[in-house]
Swiss-Prot record:
Gene that encodes it: ruvB
Keywords: ATP-binding, Cytoplasm, DNA damage, DNA recombination, DNA repair, DNA-binding, Hydrolase, Nucleotide-binding
Origin species: Bacillus cereus (strain ZK / E33L)
Subunit composition and interactions: Homohexamer. Forms an RuvA(8)-RuvB(12)-Holliday junction (HJ) complex. HJ DNA is sandwiched between 2 RuvA tetramers; dsDNA enters through RuvA and exits via RuvB. An RuvB hexamer assembles on each DNA strand where it exits the tetramer. Each RuvB hexamer is contacted by two RuvA subunits (via domain III) on 2 adjacent RuvB subunits; this complex drives branch migration. In the full resolvosome a probable DNA-RuvA(4)-RuvB(12)-RuvC(2) complex forms which resolves the HJ.
Record's keyword annotation contains ATP-binding: yes
Region (Large ATPase domain (RuvB-L)): 4-185
Protein name listed in UniProt: Holliday junction branch migration complex subunit RuvB
Amino acid sequence: MSIMDERLLSGESAYEDADLEYSLRPQTLRQYIGQDKAKHNLEVFIEAAKMREETLDHVLLYGPPGLGKTTLANIIANEMGVNVRTTSGPAIERPGDLAAVLTSLQPGDVLFIDEIHRLHRSIEEVLYPAMEDFCLDIVIGKGPSARSVRLDLPPFTLVGATTRAGALSAPLRDRFGVLSRLEYYTVDQLSAIVERTAEVFEVEIDSLAALEIARRARGTPRIANRLLRRVRDFAQVRGNGTVTMEITQMALELLQVDKLGLDHIDHKLLLGIIEKFRGGPVGLETVSATIGEESHTIEDVYEPYLLQIGFLQRTPRGRIVTPLAYEHFGMEMPKV
């Protein structure tokens, strides 16, 4: 099992998150907290499409995991007053799988493809005419007698979500009329989300406790809600049920989540570079071997937050731990 699968601070969705996220999910843009730039633009594009009685242009949502891409896709469908059909890149293995989904759509529907960067190129080619001309080219028969038949599709909106926009092919990326990058949330925004989630849980929470959870949630709502669930457990077992500052600090310390939202994996990565490679530079593959995790997981899951808070640098020569990280661990940088 990958250590990411057990990680409390992973932005990736876990099985136990699914039902919770559905119950917490806002239904409209007005209810949606954060992502103001993306939200305001979508409000305009949706309203304009409704005024023209057209489908919304295809939308690409990209950014780190756990920031609300799936939630926004569902909100887009709600705001347009249409149904949403959800699938993912890995689930579409053959062109026929995509054809089955496309032909089941009703006029105006939203098709949400999560992890769209994982679509095979042969499937992307089927998607091009569907996105551009609302038609589907299928091949009937094999060999010399094979012929291509074009089927008309109802107008629809494709909403694609990805954590790796750069992995999309240029022809696919260019077919999206709306591109929205989702950013990490501020502490105040996350605190508001934590308090809203506490209301849904019917648990009392101090405003200072909500802020403390928000500060350690790595700018990610999914992590904030997950931390609140665990702190709530401590409040019920070790306290009187109210999530106080004292309970929150105790719980997060026992969960090995430090004041900046770093956990044992972050410590292992940073301290591994500091102690074994004098802070770097060190290559990604070497870091991978050092902590026993795949390089793409390090690059896509672990490093973004460390880069965001300035604890790590990516350079042509490799990864370098910054003075801020040394200061956080109470260590002195080696002299050159």
